Structures are given as structure tokens and as C-alpha cells.
């Protein structure tokens, strides 16, 4: 019987439970945020401005390795293209075996590059909130408002107000339903964006399959090597599909904060940023690790010359081979 769906569920739960999948990266970022904030603030957590500055400097330090990160991330596609060229050129099995080994290494380097990108983005999460508060200060100044009336009866000048003053002024607390609603919406946005992009890949792949079938039907001699396929048409479908299908997800990332701000105000937008950052960070690590593991498992199965069909527990066997490796 077909156990592919069950195997996929098992694999998702497996990689979600592995400590090295999400726990260690999240703990590393948490420790980095706390240490950078603590050291830059002079061991005083009340010094928010200097603590945020320390987090920003820590993110810049992490991004200083961008050159090496980009080089390692670009290694994977190069090795993959080399393997494709070797296969289409009809080279020997030894060449293909070596390119497959390089491609597997490329998956590891790509995962490393993704980890740096995800970690640096999460590290600047608190600085992102601070920059939004600074934009609020600029907006209030443009509107002509010069005084903030805090709930405790104290009035503070807009230019001299601290981060905490703005939180008190807009009642940014977990007991505020606007903040909580924004956090739920932000958490939803991460999963919605991933779902839209994955569906886009499926639709583009379906169009590509239809084009390949059309060429098989209409262009005689492709299967026998007597005629050349229309490669340009396939490239055109993938390029147009990639651009067209990303329009709505991109607009969603722009419209969601604006719509949330119009409905829930500043507390809702801050909650949206917090929810999107926290859920998106963990989701990004999980999907990157699970995808890389599946890819390497598939290569391990192919290397053992295992035929995947509807009656074969493909994914569970692939993960088993990966664990044995």
C-alpha cells in the first residue's frame, strides 16, 4: 500500500522533535540577544537604547561573514548544475557518482548559508521593533504632536520619550487584545506565506509537465534523439511562473501591516511584528532542515539503486538510510 503520506507525517514529526533541528538554533539566538543587550547596556537591562545598539552591532558582526556565507551557499547550485551537465552529456557512472557526492555536500553548504541568513534576521528582531517605534516618533512629529500623555498622568516630550514611554502611551502589553490579535495574525502570516509559495511551486511544475507532454506529442523524434526539444519555452514557463506567482505573497507582506495598523493601531502592528518574527524564525529553521534532510535521503536512496514506486515506503526508507548514514 502507499505509505508516502504517513511517511511524510512521520518525517515532519521526526525533524520537529530532533533537538538539533530547532532547539539549538533558537537557544543560540536567544543567548546572543541577551548577551549582546546585557554587555552593551553596561549590565543594566533598564538601559534600553544602548542594549538595542548592542544587538544591532551583534547583527552587523554576524553579517560580516557574508562573503564566506554567500560563497558556500552558491556552491550547491554549481555542483547540481555540474551533475546535470554530466548526466545530459552521457558521461560515465563514475563522473555522475562524484557529482552526486559534490551535490550532497552542496546541500550542507546551502543549509549553512540559510542558517546564517535566518539567524542574522532573528537577531535583529528587537532592533526591528525599536526602528518601528522611531518611525512612530517621526510620524507624530510630522503630525505636529509634541507631548505624550502617559496613563500615570506624566507628560513627556515626543523627542525625549523613551522606548518604554511609547509602550506605555500605546498600552503595548500582553493584556491588550489588540497586541494579542496582532501576534496571532503575525504567526498566521508566516504559515500563509509558506503555503502560498509552495502552492505556487506546484502550479508552475504542473504547467511545466503539460508543456513537456505537449512537446512529446507534437515534436516527433524527441524520445529517439532525432529532434531537439524547445528548451526556451520551458525556461519561459518557469520564469513567468516564478514572477507571476510571487506577486500576491509579496503584496501580502506589504498589505498586512498596513491593514493591521488601520484596524488595531500601533499595538496591533507591534504584535504582528512579534508574532511574525517568532513563528517565522522557527518555521524557517524547521523547513530548511527538513528539506535538506529529505534531499540528502533521496540521494542516498538513489545511490543504492532503489526504485521508488507507489508500493515502496520511499520517504521512511530514505530517512532510515539517512539515519544509518
Model-derived regions, located:
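Short, well-ordered junction/capping motifs at the entry into regular secondary structure
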Residues: 1-8
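Intrinsically disordered, low-complexity polyampholyte segments enriched for Lys and acidic residues
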Residues: 2, 304, 323-325
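Short "domain-exit" segments at the C-terminal end of structured domains
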Residues: 308-325
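Hydrophobic packing and interface segments
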Residues: 4, 13-307, 316
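Short intrinsically disordered, low-complexity segments
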Residues: 8-10, 15, 320-322
